Amino acid sequence: MKGIQCKLARVALGWGVIELASRAKVSTQTITRLERGDQLRPSTLESIQSVLEEAGIEFIKENGGGIGVRFRDPD
């Protein structure tokens, strides 16, 4: 997950930085650092990504059209 994907997912869910940080059990500074492109520990990234995926976000890998996020199909 890239920082821009985190921000897009967070905004799509209507969450602020505080909400995501609380759910992922990380500091707001950690979310801010990720969203501006800083490197985080893999375990921290996994924690944040897991929370977003559990909320229904699917991460789109770079496939020629660029990276992104979308809501997972509930089926």
Sequence positions of predicted segments:
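Short basic helix-loop element that most often maps to the first helix and adjoining turn
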Residues: 6-19
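Recognition helix of helix-turn-helix/homeodomain-like DNA-binding domains
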Residues: 25-40
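DNA major-groove recognition helix of helix-turn-helix/homeodomain DNA-binding modules
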Residues: 25, 42-60
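Short, conserved glycine- and acidic-residue-centered signature motifs
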Residues: 2, 13, 41
